[in-house]
């Protein structure tokens, strides 16, 4: 597994502390539990599931996770948050409305560990 420093990620995201939901999610992930998050928009769900996701990735340059979302805008937003975490883990978003060959080229050159689509 990749060593991820949560405090460093929070500092990069300009977050002083985790919300109760985010803290519970991190704790339950460490216990090996499956999680379902139900919470209003803007409550921090993205960070709540991205922190355990990045902690679960191995130090291998292969695709390890796919995050499925209902819209292009949300895919781009999550990709941006992921990159802002500053982990150095390669991530890309894939969505309709752009040439498939462009995505294929990007995927081959980037070799993402995480795809958001």
Give names to the regions the model predicted.
Residues 3-8, 62-117:
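Conserved nucleic-acid-binding Ia/Ib motif block in the N-terminal RecA-like helicase ATPase lobe
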Residues 44-46, 98-99:
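Gly/Ser/Thr-rich beta-alpha loop segments that engage phosphate groups in nucleotides
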Residues 1-38:
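Conserved pre-motif I regulatory segment
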Residues 39-43:
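The conserved Walker
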Residues 35-38, 50-51, 68, 74:
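Generic leucine side-chain signal with a strong bias for well-ordered alpha-helical environments
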Residues 23-35, 45-60, 81-85:
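Walker A/P-loop NTP-binding motif
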């Amino acid at each position: 597994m990749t060593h991820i420093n949560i405090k460093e990620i929070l500092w990069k995201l300009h977050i002083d502390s985790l919300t109760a939901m985010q803290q519970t999610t991190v704790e339950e992930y460490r216990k090996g539990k499956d999680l379902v998050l139900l919470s209003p928009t803007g409550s921090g769900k993205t960070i709540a599931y991205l922190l355990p996701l990045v902690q679960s990735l191995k130090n291998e340059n292969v695709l390890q996770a796919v995050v499925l979302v209902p819209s292009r805008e949300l895919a781009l937003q999550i990709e941006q948050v992921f990159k802002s975490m500053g982990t150095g883990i390669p991530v890309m978003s894939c969505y309709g409305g752009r040439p498939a060959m462009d995505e294929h080229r990007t995927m081959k050159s980037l070799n993402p560990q995480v795809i958001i689509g």
